[in-house]
Amino acid sequence: MKVVIDNLGVVKHATIDLDKNILLFCGPNNSGKTYIAYVLNALLSQSPVLRSVMNNAVMKDQNGTTYTINITKELIVEYLKLASSYLQQNMGSIFGLSEEMEKSFFRSFKLECIYDDADYKRFFNDKFSLYYQADDRKYNGRKAKNSSEITIEISTM
């Protein structure tokens, strides 16, 4: 996936290829490295947007403890569009700025995510698991190789 950023402070245009194994931002002080890192972090961790997109894609088991999500390319693209739009409208919250300052600093900021068939094929072919713990709940997720479904089991501690 590629992320295209325009007019982010001193950064007039940047294309970041997230398919690389490592991303290294280097340059002189005040060249926009931190701004780009903040935007990428915010884009990839948009929980409210992710929840709204996933609501229609989730299938629960009868006990309500296991969820299966069928991740389609269209679902990923929808999420990325919503997350990009949300970020463009809420840049002040990322950088701790007032609404007035946000409008002044980021009025021409643009963010675009380019997600193509090759990206989805890599996702489809990958196998992974994840673990997350919050409050008194544990979340265990897994995705099998050559599958578009992610299964998440929720248990209490």
What are these regions (language model features)?
Residues 1-157:
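P-loop NTPase switch/coupling surface
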